[in-house]
Design a protein with these regions (language model features):
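N-terminal intrinsically disordered, cationic/polar leader segments
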Residues: 2-126, 132-184
Length: 184
């Protein structure tokens, strides 16, 4: 038997019975999660095939990345991970791959600064492995070695971007800017 003050007796297994119901039947608990993920845009160009498939030169690979988030409905945001990968050699362009991989994310009852961090750091971190696989498959299907992208530290990129923005605001304002809540 559990004693008074025991961890098991202190659990409120039926919060509705304790009068903790959300007002008007609305859930007021924080909620974050993906509804779905999808390829929004995919373009693969192999402009110099079939000659480029026989080039023995070491290509220069360029990767550009961008992250976007837009409101798609009440408490729903579309997060886009945009990746442009290209390979060039002295003989010409081997391939160009453009991918927009997106996800619909529910963000409910979360403070704005935490929601922003989730949409621009954590959600892209979750989407990236799927986008990485699509890029690798696309380059392989174009006749080249699969382009295996290294993991990306989206949290570090997010913090770096916040720091850059703060410095820009300080420079524009002539004084020290007060960081928003949640910025480090």
């Amino acid at each position: 038997m559990a004693d008074e003050g025991d961890i098991l007796t202190d659990l409120d297994l039926d919060p509705a019975a304790g009068g903790n119901e959300p007002p008007n039947g609305r859930d007021n608990q924080p909620q974050v999660g993906f509804l779905t993920q999808y390829i929004k845009d995919l373009s693969v160009e192999n402009p110099n095939a079939p000659a480029s498939l026989q080039w023995n030169e070491q290509p220069q690979v360029d990767l550009q990345m961008n992250i976007g988030a837009n409101e798609a409905g009440e408490d729903v945001h579309e997060v886009e991970l945009k990746l442009n990968a290209g390979a060039k050699a002295a003989s010409g362009v081997l391939y160009a791959v453009e991918l927009v991989y997106a996800g619909l994310v529910v963000v409910r009852n979360i403070p704005d600064e935490q929601a922003h961090a989730f949409l621009y750091a954590e959600a892209p971190r979750i989407l990236f492995p799927f986008a990485r696989t699509i890029i690798a498959d696309a380059t392989r299907d174009a006749g080249f070695q699969p382009l295996l992208l290294d993991p990306i530290d989206f949290n570090a990129l997010y913090m770096q971007r916040l720091d850059e923005k703060r410095r820009e605001e300080e420079a524009a304002g002539g004084g020290a800017a007060t960081p928003s809540a949640g910025e480090a």
